[in-house]
Amino acid sequence: MNTKVPIYSVSGEMKGEIDLPEVFDTEVREDIIRRAFRAISLSMRQPYGSSPLAGMRRVGHTTRPGLGISRMPRIAGGSRVVGIASAVGGKSAHSPRTTKNLYVKINDRERKMAKYSAIALTASVEAVKKRGHRFKEGLKLPIVVEDGVEGINKTKDAIALLKNLGVYEDIERSREGKHIRAGRGKMRGRRYKQPKSVLIVARNSSAMKAFRSLPGVDIASPNSLSIRKLAPGGVGGRLTIFTEGAIESLKEVDQ
């Protein structure tokens, strides 16, 4: 099924139409999207573990039988037990190991299906609205712009483009949604949480620096698209802007 969507210029005016690649007709499998997101997120965990010397920094002496006390290692001249898991301040019986393999496997076909399903959901108005994104009524998704937007080098010009396209309201939603997270994470370098807004997919993603400082905006190239950017939190339907060159690159995707 060839679906046509409008192409917008740098000024936000419609300049033509383009056929969407077959990847946008992929069967949507939200369960596989969640599974792939979980596998990728868990695989990014940082290994952690306790010190090999934890609980073993005291010298303990084992007593002989016949003294009426248990034969556990104790400090010299005292009765305090040290160096075993059941002792106060002793070592952990089965502490975390930094050598543990935290990688979570997922089938290649499932990983590809998750990515293609997430791309297909970017063209669903219902899925994008359900995710909470805000945009102009009657806007046809996905949004495709000409390659000239890669030459935008000022943030004020980027804001003007997003306003002309009718998606700047989603940037405001992300800015207003920034809040201090609950729990200990606020003390560990991740104090704030902020909703994701627009994803911009461009063939030359490194050239689109003008969009980087906008709240919740992510930039990616067609080759670096990941389920973490297409479906944050494992929920597909992210509001996405593709450049004309990025759409052409997606036509080469092997279904």
Swiss-Prot record:
Gene Ontology terms: cellular component: ribonucleoprotein complex; ribosome
Domain of life: Archaea
Record carries keyword rRNA-binding: yes
Gene Ontology biological process terms from the UniProt entry: translation
Membrane spanning residue stretches: none
Gene Ontology terms for molecular function: rRNA binding; structural constituent of ribosome
Keywords recorded for this protein, A-Z: Ribonucleoprotein, Ribosomal protein, RNA-binding, rRNA-binding
Disulfide bonds: none
Family the UniProt entry places it in: Belongs to the universal ribosomal protein uL4 family.
Function, in words: One of the primary rRNA binding proteins, this protein initially binds near the 5'-end of the 23S rRNA. It is important during the early stages of 50S assembly. It makes multiple contacts with different domains of the 23S rRNA in the assembled 50S subunit and ribosome. Forms part of the polypeptide exit tunnel.
Assembly and interaction partners: Part of the 50S ribosomal subunit.
The name this protein goes by in its record: Large ribosomal subunit protein uL4
